């Protein structure tokens, strides 16, 4: 972690840091100068540092460009929001030497991208990280443990068991809980905000995108049974956000009736409750195969480059002012 106090450091110092924290002296600088310094430091940061969170009091426009989630997050008022972050999978289809949530993605473990984003959102009351005890001492996790909002839970045999264990870790007065796969590190703050807003209004919401490919059904894996109507099909993502008690009741109902569920909102559907579809982003892919890792790196690099171009334009505008 690198701190700025007065004069900007050189480029190579910034590029050695994983994240950037600006500790400025407001009494000695005007708001305009603070904005210039923040923009300059953000520009010097590597393009992969997309989720760097500068702590600076500046204009809303500057804060948005700096991608400071705590500055722009707008979670529902009068709601206590928590996350259950599922990081207990083995990722066998990735064919790697370790679970996919610990694979390197542009110099950081996949799970680190998740945590940096979620812990930067001030409106989140608690984050329950569902992860095996053997991985909780990994070096990159140490810097997050000082945040009192982060607690741990043990994975279960199945996804449902892991979610239930995670639910046990949220506060009793939590009103909305988001279930999120650690293997989806590309989710954006905007998508999270919109899904929370829909869940607050409808009690259950899930990120989803319209299905692009033509989907055919087969009952034997050899011949086509029928072609499904693509206009009615949605590709479901995470986070999936619900009222905690609704989710608990859904699990009880599914267990009693021995119903198979494939995701979290399915248990709500089985009780006849409506689930709001929040239109997400196609870039919020789940890392499942080696090819997905390549795509994810490309997306992150593109985001970083676009961010730096926007920052450069903002900086030029500030420098032209008298």
Predicted features, each with a name:
Residues 45-77:
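N-terminal mitochondrial targeting presequence
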């Amino acid at each position: 972690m690198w701190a700025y106090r007065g004069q900007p450091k050189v480029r190579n110092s910034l590029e050695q840091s994983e994240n950037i924290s600006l500790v400025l002296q407001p009494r000695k600088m005007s708001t305009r100068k603070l904005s210039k310094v923040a923009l300059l430091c953000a520009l010097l940061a590597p393009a992969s540092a997309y989720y760097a969170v500068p702590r600076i009091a500046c204009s809303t426009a500057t804060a948005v460009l700096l991608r400071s989630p705590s500055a722009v997050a707008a979670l529902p008022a009068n709601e206590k929001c928590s996350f259950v972050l599922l990081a207990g999978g083995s990722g066998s289809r990735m064919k790697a030497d370790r679970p996919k949530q610990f694979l390197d993605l542009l110099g950081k473990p996949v799970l680190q991208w998740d945590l940096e984003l979620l812990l930067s959102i001030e409106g989140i009351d608690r984050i329950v990280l569902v992860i095996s005890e053997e991985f909780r001492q990994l070096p990159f996790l140490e810097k997050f443990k000082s945040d009192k909002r982060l607690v741990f839970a043990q994975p279960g045999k199945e996804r449902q068991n892991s979610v239930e264990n995670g639910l046990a870790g949220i506060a009793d007065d939590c009103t909305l809980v988001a279930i999120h796969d650690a293997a989806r590190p590309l989710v954006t703050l905007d998508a999270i905000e919109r899904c929370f807003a829909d869940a607050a209004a409808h009690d259950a919401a899930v990120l989803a995108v319209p299905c692009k490919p033509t989907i055919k059904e087969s009952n034997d894996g050899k011949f086509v049974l029928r072609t499904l109507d693509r206009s009615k099909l949605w590709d479901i993502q995470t986070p999936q956000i619900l009222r905690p008690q609704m989710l608990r009741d859904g699990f009880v109902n599914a267990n009693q009736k021995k119903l198979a569920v494939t995701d979290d909102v399915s248990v709500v559907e089985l009780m006849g409750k409506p689930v709001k579809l929040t239109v997400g982003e196609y870039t919020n892919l789940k890392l499942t195969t080696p090819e997905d890792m390549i795509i994810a790196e490309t997306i992150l690099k593109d985001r970083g480059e676009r961010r730096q171009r926007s920052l450069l334009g903002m900086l030029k505008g500030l420098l032209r002012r008298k």
